[in-house]
């Protein structure tokens, strides 16, 4: 299993002033950094790729969809724009020689409904992601569906729903991205959800129930690592916690969950590596 860190441990938006975070992640013993692509016009692929290559370091990318990129919108023009944006994210991922792109890429992040999601909304999402997946296949990029909690999406809250959407898309490079923070709200069992993802699992966010330092809260880490060991997981796993509360993120973090990003990484990594050792990962 490859252990990394989400850049939001230190920042609230990615741009060229954050390039040194790549060096910092490597110094702290990480094997990759997860880079957010929410603001693509500030993402300098050449600069990021150059820094990664100079260090021999790895990366993956992620994003969420907004009003103007919602591929479950009833407006065909917005769905088309969402497909265009996701393709641009895939291209940016390939441009930095990364192979994994994931997140809330199936519907607008934070969308309120009057009722349950409809078959039409699932179909719009699947049709759009199928087009993106076909484009991504030519660039060697996998796409991960990340289930998130009921307060952040109406479409995919559980691993079971993510697998259902994957089957609708019907492309091999569509994979599953699990997140323990969201699983703690929506799943009956960390173990069962991880086993269900199985060979389709491509990325795992290792978060405490309050998004604080892993190992300091309520998450059942033995359940998680037992399952990861049983499926022989060798993919990406990133600490994802938000220490900088001052930016433009919808993270709903109103207090310091760790003294700083470095403490989050060092203490969280120490705990996660102890669990990896315990379960032979």
Positions of PLM-derived features:
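Generic enzyme active-site microenvironment
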Residues: 32, 144, 176-180, 238-239
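Structural motif corresponding to the early beta-alpha repeats
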Residues: 31, 35-126, 234, 238-248, ...
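Anion (oxyanion) recognition and catalysis
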Residues: 26, 53, 94, 137, ...
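Active-site-proximal loop/turn and secondary-structure-junction residues that shape catalytic pockets
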Residues: 9-11, 37-39, 65-68, 105-109, ...
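Active-site acidic/histidine proton-transfer and metal-coordination neighborhood
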Residues: 77-175, 258-264, 270, 279
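Histidine-acidic metal/acid-base catalytic patches
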Residues: 1-7, 11, 15-27, 97-99, ...
């Amino acid at each position: 299993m490859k252990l990394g860190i989400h850049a939001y441990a230190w920042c609230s938006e990615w741009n060229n002033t954050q390039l040194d975070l790549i060096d910092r992640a490597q110094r702290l013993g990480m094997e990759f950094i997860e880079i957010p692509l929410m603001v693509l016009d500030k993402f300098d692929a050449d600069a990021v790729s150059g820094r990664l290559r100079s260090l021999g370091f790895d990366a993956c990318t992620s994003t969420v969809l907004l009003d103007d990129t919602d591929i479950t919108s009833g407006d065909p023009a917005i769905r088309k724009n969402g497909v265009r944006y996701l393709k641009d994210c895939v291209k940016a991922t390939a441009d930095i020689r990364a192979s994994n792109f994931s997140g809330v890429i199936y519907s607008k992040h934070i969308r309120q409904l009057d009722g349950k999601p409809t078959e039409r909304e699932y179909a719009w999402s699947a049709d759009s992601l199928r087009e993106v997946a076909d484009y991504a296949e030519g660039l060697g990029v996998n796409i991960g569906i990340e289930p998130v909690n009921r307060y952040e999406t109406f479409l995919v809250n559980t691993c079971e729903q993510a697998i259902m959407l994957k089957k609708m898309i019907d492309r091999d490079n569509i994979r599953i991205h699990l997140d323990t923070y969201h699983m703690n709200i929506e799943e009956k069992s960390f173990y069962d959800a991880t086993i269900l993802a199985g060979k389709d699992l491509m990325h795992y966010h290792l978060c405490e129930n309050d998004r604080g330092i892993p190992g300091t809260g309520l998450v059942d880490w033995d359940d998680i690592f037992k399952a990861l060991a049983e499926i022989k997981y060798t993919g990406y796993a990133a600490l994802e916690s938000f220490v900088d509360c001052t930016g433009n993120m919808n993270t709903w973090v109103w207090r310091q969950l760790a003294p700083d990003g470095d403490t989050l990484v060092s203490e969280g990594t120490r705990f996660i590596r102890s669990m990896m050792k315990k379960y032979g990962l």
